[in-house]
């Protein structure tokens, strides 16, 4: 079977698809991946045959992909739900296709077109956090979210007797002001901090803070006591999968909805932009780490739920039947 994956050309939209794409390749199928060149290096490293449709840079339009569909003649197309172009191209060509999610559906303010519900959806969100209307109306294929990150040479986590917290604002929402405020609050609470600052330059930081441009998030998460982040779906699901409580500092897109869902579930606390200060961060992280708050227990319960979801390997073995639905 020949399977074509497609995503927007960003880490947050491409990385969630890589575990399933790799599992499909390891199951003996031929895999190709349509995306802009920004993410080709990671796709090449995983043997996923990336290519850039036409002149597409970030988003892929149906007209960009149609010549490649004629060339490759895939049996199945799997595309993230932020990409409507591949869905349209697949429909025109009569090729079965599946939506691949990356979190809760359908978040307000994310700026993406909602997919139609007439085709199956690979759902990586644990049911307890998923939108109840979506659960009731969509044809879902449960898929365990598996964190993917690029390995870094000589990476290691050093623990002390103090709590360790991972701080990130993702690839698109980082600002020096928010990161600095969070660092001030975390260090005031007596916490060691690992920061993934992206392209933000922070200058001098306290001795108990380690700043990196990027970290191998999937390798780091099992070792931390809490995650302080923007509420992006990748970090949210990655932390939940290992049972780590979260402090969410939402900045935009789907992050406010994620913060609300996590707070209701008891696995997180959140601080809105207008309420963010070093004091509010320190107070919140103390509550988060306190056994009396129950946040770790709630996060671990969701981790157990995620562990029961079908793995990428299990889902990959079942994909051929969806290709037969022509």
Regions found by a protein language model. Name each.
Residues 1-104, 177, 181, 187-326:
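Glycosyltransferase specificity loop/lid
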Residues 36, 40, 109-164, 168-173, ...:
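A nucleotide-sugar donor-handling region in carbohydrate enzymes
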């Amino acid at each position: 079977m020949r399977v074509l994956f497609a995503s927007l050309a960003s880490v947050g939209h491409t990385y969630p698809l890589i575990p399933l794409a790799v599992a499909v390749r390891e199951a003996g199928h031929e895999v190709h991946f349509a995306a802009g060149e920004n993410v080709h290096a990671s796709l090449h490293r995983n043997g996923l045959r990336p290519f850039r449709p036409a002149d597409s840079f970030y988003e892929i339009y149906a007209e960009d992909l149609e010549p490649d569909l004629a060339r490759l003649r895939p049996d199945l197309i799997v595309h993230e739900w932020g990409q409507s172009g591949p869905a349209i191209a697949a429909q025109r060509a009569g090729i079965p296709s599946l939506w691949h999610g990356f979190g809760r559906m359908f978040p307000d303010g994310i700026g993406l077109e909602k997919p139609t519900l007439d085709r199956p959806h690979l759902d990586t969100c644990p049911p307890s956090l998923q939108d109840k209307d979506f659960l009731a109306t969509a044809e879902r294929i449960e898929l365990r979210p598996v964190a993917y990150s690029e390995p870094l040479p000589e990476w290691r986590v050093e623990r002390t007797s103090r709590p360790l917290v991972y701080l990130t604002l993702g690839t698109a929402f980082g600002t020096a002001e928010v990161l600095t405020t969070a660092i001030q609050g975390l260090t005031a609470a007596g916490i060691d901090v690992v920061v993934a600052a992206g392209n933000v330059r922070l200058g001098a930081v306290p001795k108990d803070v380690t700043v990196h441009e990027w970290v191998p998030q999937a390798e780091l998460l099992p070792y931390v006591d809490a995650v302080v982040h923007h509420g992006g779906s990748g970090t949210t699901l990655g932390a939940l999968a290992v049972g780590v409580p979260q402090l969410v500092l939402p900045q935009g897109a789907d992050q406010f909805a994620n913060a609300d869902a996590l707070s209701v579930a008891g696995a997180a606390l959140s601080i809105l932009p207008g309420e963010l200060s070093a004091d509010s961060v320190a107070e919140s992280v103390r509550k988060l780490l306190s056994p009396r708050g129950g946040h770790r227990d709630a996060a671990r319960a969701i981790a157990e739920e995620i562990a029961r979801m079908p793995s990428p390997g299990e889902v990959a073995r079942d994909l051929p039947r969806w290709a037969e639905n022509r």
